Structure formats: C-alpha cells, structure tokens
Amino acid sequence: VLAAQSGNVITEVVGREAPEEIVVIGAHLDSWDLGTGAVDDGAGVGITMAALELIKDAGLAPRRTIRLVLWGAEEVGLLGANAYRDQHEGELEQHVIGSESDFGGGRVWKITADSQTEEGDALFAEIARLLAPIGIAPGDDNQPGGGPDLYPLIAAGVPTLRLHQDGRDYFDLHHTADDTVDKL
C-alpha cells in the first residue's frame, strides 16, 4: 500500500453584511489515473475559480462570504470533503448553501436544490431568479446532490444547489485516457 498526502485549497471573498454566513463553491483537484483529468474535474476547478474571479474583477461585494474549496482526494473516497467537514464542524450551521462543479464543462441548463431549510428555499429562489435571464431554469426535484464532495455537507444538514449540465459526452470521457484538455 502506497501512502500519500493530499490537501484542500481554500480561499474566500469575505461578505459585506453577513461575513459569518458561508456560501461554498468548489471542485476536486485529483483525477483518475488514466487521463489528465481535464473534464473530471479540471473543468470544475476552472469554472469555480473563474466564478470567484469574476466576482472580484467586477468589484462586487457579496452579502455573504463566498468560499472556494478545491477538494483533494475525491476519487479515492472523498477524503478532502470529509476532512473539510471535520475541520469546519463548528461552523457548518453557518454554511447557507454549497455547490460543486463536477460534471465537465457543458452548459448549465437547470438548477435544483436540496434546501433543507426555509432560508435555503429563499436563497434557492433568489438564485433561480438571477439565473433565469441567462436561460438556466429552476427544477423542482429537490433531491440531495450537487456533487460527491458535497455529500458530507449534505449529511451535516447544509443546503446544496445542483448544477445540471449538458453531459452528453461526459461519460465517454470520464475516468478514461480520453479525459484530456482538447475535449473542453
């Protein structure tokens, strides 16, 4: 058995009105051994980092803290996600919603939520309202999800938002030697 270390990378934009309330966005850093991990999950890393960069570049000051987490060791058992949950156990009640990008680089066409709280329902409704003008529809299936790295947060009661993406070719590339940057 080969022992190795992994870690999470965390950065955030502190909220202006409710800095103690945390919105988590993220993706996982590791990949399957056959490919380079461009689709799974380099695309997700790029999407979430770009989202945070757009907020900063636009000079926006979010109401709540937006925390970007790039999880380590997802492919071998959600080790980074479990470590994040354990290390932030005392502040999980302040996590108002979480979302992960882990389905390639396809267009987001629908969002759904596992809101778990009235505040989560209200936040989901506001997010849906903001995304409607760019053609992203709200769904009503209200099932747990949002990406594997969110499972430990879901189990802890954190509301989640799932990005439904165009994944027509995702499983042709996922965990294969074809998961390369030219597919993005």
Annotate each PLM feature.
Residues 53-79:
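Short helix-loop-beta-strand segments that form the rim/entrance of peptidase-like active sites
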Residues 42-50, 78-79, 83:
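Short amphipathic alpha-helical face segments that pack within enzyme cores
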Residues 171-182:
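Short helix/strand-capping connector loops at secondary-structure junctions
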Residues 48, 65-67, 159:
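A fold-wide structural signal in alpha/beta-hydrolase
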Residues 23-26, 63-72, 97-99:
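Beta-strand segments within the central parallel beta-sheet cores of soluble alpha/beta enzyme folds
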